[in-house]
Amino acid sequence: INFNVCCETSQGLSYARNRGIEEAKGDILVYVDDDATVNREYLSTIAQFFDRYPDAMAAGGAIYPVYETKEPKWMSKYTRELITAYKDEGRRVIRMTGSRFPSGGNAAYRREVFDRVGRFDPTLGRRGNLLISGEEKAIFYSMKKLDMPIYYLPSMILYHIIPQSKLTKQYFDNLTLSIGRS
């Protein structure tokens, strides 16, 4: 696998992702959050999946939090999903229908997706300390309007590193307010 590192001078997640689209030479584009690690077979799993599912236009996988400290007692299923992007849809490959989507921090797309639906909206997505979001959902919604299949791939595992600073009420309030603005 060939890797190319480039620098995007415009600050923001959507700008970086769009730069990746422009720079990439392959057919499959993979996006992983910068505060995460993946399982050893991550890229080979994705490559094999797209070979086996030629109809698939995008896929996302499981996301498990790795806390730098203990998970707080106040954490519920709902706060965990918001703060950590936790996702576990089971052990089978499934087509994500209706309002089900992968997380953008653990997603792979065929290049054709961006030729057909456009790029990530730079007015959305993380930018500096702003926690706005929704740029991936906009892409996924556009894909679903065109009936482009999106799958959940359980063996596409991402471990999301959660620092203590994200386990505070202040962070949670800022996050939910930002999501509401998005």
What residues fall within each predicted segment?
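Short aromatic/hydrophobic "clamp" motif used to bind/position activated sugar donors
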Residues: L29
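Glycine-rich, basic loop-to-helix element that forms the pyrophosphate-binding segment
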Residues: E8-A24
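The conserved acidic donor/metal-binding loop of glycosyltransferases
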Residues: D33-T37
